[in-house]
Amino acid sequence: MSKRVYIAALGTETNQFVPFPTGLRGYQEHGIWHGDATQHAPTNFTAPVHVWRKETEKRGWTVIEGLSTFAAPSGTTVRKVYEDFRDEILDGIKAALPLDAVLINVHGAMVADGYDDCEGDLLSRIRAIVGPKVAIGAEFDLHCHLSALMLDSADVLVGYKEYPHTDTMERAAELFAIIADTVEGRVKPVMARYDCRMIAQYRTSVPPISEFVVRMKSLEGKDGILSVSLSHGFSFADVEDVGTRTLVVADGDMAKAQALAEQLGKELWDNRERYATKYLTVDEAMDRAASHNQGPLVLADRADNPGSGAPGDSTFVLKALIEREIGPALFGVMWDPMAFQIAEEAGEGARIRMRLGGKSGTVSGDPVDLDVTVKKIARNVFQPYGPVMSPLGDMALLSSEHVDIAICTRRNQTFHADAFRAVGAEPADYRVVIVKSAQHFYNGFVGVAKEILYVATPGAADPDVTRWPYTKRKTPFWPKVADPWK
């Protein structure tokens, strides 16, 4: 008899420290597919669903596709929006019974009004519907909160290993293979997690943390170890499970899974200073930029990364560039629909007085008033992000005395140098380039940049986790406490 597999996707990354919610419109902007996501071009979030359909049909099994939707990282999701999406998935599962497996693509750091652990809530409700014999698998972003409820409710959890997230489809295939083996009785997965008592950020594209990722991969497929994941955690949420955790999936041996999760977690702890991303202050970054003569120097404005839920309109670095008269500089992409409207009305070539940024509250700083020339207007701009294209809406390039500023109408982080090229700015021609991104820009700029540095500005995604008011985590963590094990 053909196996029956239900596939769906629901997620966002919730920054609880920003002053705006995530409502229905946030999901509509990125797409809501009611059972037909695989009939459309894949997005970064629906790509796993495409993989699962292909793999299911390859085996001659029956696939039932449910809801797929994702919202860009932002504030807490409105309760009704989450519950409506969740219930659509649950109702679809009920209608599809009997099932042999359920595969869900989630983020792992989704928070809604009344739900600190949306993924745990969703998975536990799925388990209550399908019972103990149906295999449940979930793929998650490595910036997740790996909760006990998630582990208790699913058979297999597999996280991205790479940041930038270049391996979403690879991890989807890995998860499917383990779930297929589970359904056919070849393996009996068990999972264990380990709390590293750390909250930090890790850039897996470069050593030494890249070496840790290679080691994780080398352990899989041997000695009964099915999968190894590192949950970096998502720093900008006040939930009980915030922080870094290791996860090991083993074939029927919980003691082995727990031992390896602890071993890897302790290895991470021992190397915490080496593995965690190092940041410059704004002043330090400006000093480096002022002395840099073999550009472009690329500076990541980490705290205003829309990919971490920040608005994308902060002005702290822009002000510093102007005050220090550092240039030629390229800055962006800044989210400022109002400024775009003014630039559009003025037209290309116009010289106007413009108020830029600082519109989303204190996390964005004060607006900056500049005399600028509207150099270029571009409509419906997309930028590459791995195998998919990511939207920026309409864009304009505004030129002041020392700085060219790219603005957009659709909030998104800067993934690729092509975002600037869309408005006629070639990053290679500038002394310094400032990108509103934390790390996903890396692959799109490493071929252009002479050097890449990371800046800790004030803002909604400030990487200094000692400043954030965590109230729900029950155990201490580094770096707020030097030794949280004492």
Question: Which residues are covered by each model-predicted region?
Answer:
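Hard-cation-handling environments
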Residues: 202-402, 406-410
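Structural motif
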Residues: 4-6, 62-64, 100-102, 134-138, ...
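Extended hydrophobic packing segments that form well-structured cores
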Residues: 46, 65, 269, 381-486
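Internal, active-site/partner-interface "lid" segment
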Residues: 183-212
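Glycine-rich phosphate/diphosphate-binding loops that line cofactor/substrate pockets in enzymes
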Residues: 1-2, 57-61, 65, 91-102, ...
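N-terminal amphipathic/basic leader segments beginning at the initiator methionine
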Residues: 2-58
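Low-complexity, highly charged intrinsically disordered N-terminal segments
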Residues: 53-73, 77-81, 85, 89-93
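Active-site histidine-anchored catalytic micro-motif
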Residues: 6, 11-13, 75, 79-86, ...
